[in-house]
Amino acid sequence: MSKKLKDLPVSSTFTSNLPPDPLVPTVQAMKKADDRILHVPRFVEGGGLFTYLTPSLKANSQLLAYSPSSVKSLGLEESETQTEAFQQLVVGSNVDVNKCCPWAQCYGGYQFGDWAGQLGDGRVVSLCELTNPETGKRFEIQVKGAGRTPYSRFADGKAVLRSSIREYLCCEALYALGIPTTQALAISNLEGVVAQRETVEPCAVVCRMAPSWIRIGTFDLQGINNQIESLRKLADYCLNFVLKDGFHGGDTGNRYEKLLRDVAYRNAKTVAKWQAYGFMNGVLNTDNTSILGLSIDYGPFGFLDVYNPSFTPNHDDVFLRYSYRNQPDIIIWNLSKLASALVELIGACDKVDDLQYMEQLHNSTDLLKKAFAYTSEVFEKIVEEYKNIVQNDFYDLMFKRVGLPSDSSNKILITDLLQILEDYELDMPNCFSFLSRNSPSSMENEEYAAKLMQACICLNPNNERVRNESVKAFTNWVGRYSEATKTQEDSSRLASMKKVNPHFTLRNWVLEEVIKEAYIGKFELFKKVCKMAACPFEDTWGFSKEEEDYLCYNTTPSKSQIQCSCSS
C-alpha cells in the first residue's frame, strides 16, 4: 500500500555508525559552527567519514520532473510528488536537523590512475535515509547542486542544468534496462541561479537515491591516511548495513576477505550488463565505483552507437583508459585498490579481532609482508571469479538479445555478429532492435541481410564497398542464425527478444537536443525523452511515428560517437 512522505521511516545509519569530522562531531556542534567550517573547502583529518551540514544554496525552485519508478521504490503515492513537502525535500530546503541532520561524505580516489587525495561530496548533501515500509528497503536521499561543502575543493558547489538533465535521464535509462544504478527521484530548476563553466549556464538540483553512496574511494582515503580503526568501522558498517542483502562473500577467509569478494561479485554483475548494452561510464575512477556495484555519478557517459570497442565518450580520456573495451579491466584495477586498503584487515586472517596482534601487524615489516602476500593470493582468485562472472553474464544476456538458447556452441554467432558491426562501423542499438522486430524466416537471407545493413549503416552510408561487403557478411551470418533459431516459434522468440532489446537508446545526440531546447526554456522534448528512457522497450510512446523513429533510429555520422567533457 502506497504511503505519504510523512509515513516513511526516517533514519541515518551512516552517521550513527561512522566517525564524524572531528571539527563537527555532533549536530549541536554543527549548529554552532562557523560557515568556514561547514561550507569552505578544507582537509578533514582524524579518520572522519562525513561532515554534518545543511545545503547552503537557497533559491526558488521549479519541479521539472519526478521518476515514477523511484517514487514506487520508496513506496510513495504518486500524488505526493505534487505536495509542498515533496518539492521541498527534492531540493533540500526546509530541513529539520533535529529529526535527521544532513551530511556530506568524505572520500578520496584514484583519478585516471593517479592518487587525487581527498575528494568527497563537493556539491552533494545527503538529507536522510527513507525506508519503504512495505519492502523494508532503505534509501539514502541526496541533493546534488546544493552548494559548497568542506569537500568542494576549487568548485562552486553548483550543478548546471545540462549535467543535471544528463544524470537524471541516465538514471532512468539504466534502471529501465535492468542495469544496477543509483536512482534519480526528481530534477528541479533553480530560478535565477547560474554558474560559470565554458559559458554562463543555468543551474538545477537532482535529488537522487541509493541504498548506499559508499565508494571504493571511501576506503581508499582511510587506507592511504593509515586510519585503520576508521577503516575497520567503515568495513563493519558495510557488512552490517549495506551488503547484507544478496551477500556473496563465499565461505573462505575472514569477514573482510568476504567483503572484498562480495564487492567484486556485485561489480562483475554490473560490468557484464554495461558491456552487453554498450554503456560506458566515461570516468571510472575509484571514487566512481560503488561498493554495491551500482552505476554511479554520471558525467561524460555514453552508449555505443557505432560498435567501436575503443570508443570512449570522455573527450579528456586521450589514452582510452575508460573506453568500452577497457571497462572490465579498469574495475579490476579499482578493486585492487580496495584490496590494498584492506590488506591489514584481510591479511590478519582469523586474528583480525585480536587488537594486540593487529598492533603488532601494523608495526612489523615481516607480518605486513605476509599480510600482503596472503591478500595478493586472495585477490588473484577473486579476479578469476570476477572474469568468469563477467563473461558468463555477458553471454547469457547476449543470448537473450539475439534469441538463442544459452549454449556455448552459439557463442560464435554473437562474436561474429559483433565483429561484423565493428568491421563495417555499424550501429549496435539499431542492429539489435532490428533483430527483435524482424524474423529471418520472413524473407530470403540476402534480403534480410540487406535490410539489416540498411538499419544499422552509420559512418559510411554512401560507401558502396562497405554496403556490399557488409551485406555479404550479414548474409553468411543470417544463414547460420536462421539455422540456430529454426526450432523456435517466431512470435514467442521475438516477443522475448523485445523485452531485452530497447527500441529507444539514450544517445548523446538526443541528450544534446534535449539540453539545447531546455536552455531556451522549452521542456517538451525533455518530457518525451523522460517517458522513452523510462520505458525503452515499448513499440510506441504515443508520439508521432516520424518523431519516434527519429529519436530511436537516427544514426548519421554527425550524430555518432559524440564525446563529452567532465564539465558539470
Swiss-Prot record:
Keywords: ATP-binding, Disulfide bond, Magnesium, Metal-binding, Mitochondrion, Nucleotide-binding, Nucleotidyltransferase, Transferase, Transit peptide. It is found in: Mitochondrion. GO terms for molecular function: AMPylase activity; ATP binding; metal ion binding. ATP binds at residues 120, 122-123, 144, 156-157, 208, 215, 297. It comes from the Eukaryota. The active site is at residue 287. GO terms for biological process: cellular oxidant detoxification. Mg(2+) binds at residues 288, 297. It is an enzyme of class 2 (transferase). Catalyzes the transfer of adenosine 5'-monophosphate (AMP) to Tyr residues of target mitochondrial proteins (AMPylation). Involved in redox homeostasis by regulating the cellular response to oxidative stress. Regulates protein S-glutathionylation levels possibly by AMPylation of deglutathionylation enzymes such as glutaredoxins. It comes from Schizosaccharomyces pombe (strain 972 / ATCC 24843) (Fission yeast). Belongs to the SELO family. Pfam families: SelO (PF02696). Its cofactor is Mg(2+). Its main location: mitochondrion. Its EC number is 2.7.7.-. InterPro entries: SelO. This is Protein adenylyltransferase SelO, mitochondrial. GO terms for cellular component: mitochondrion. It catalyses: L-tyrosyl-[protein] + ATP = O-(5'-adenylyl)-L-tyrosyl-[protein] + diphosphate. Forms probably one or more intrachain disulfide bridges.
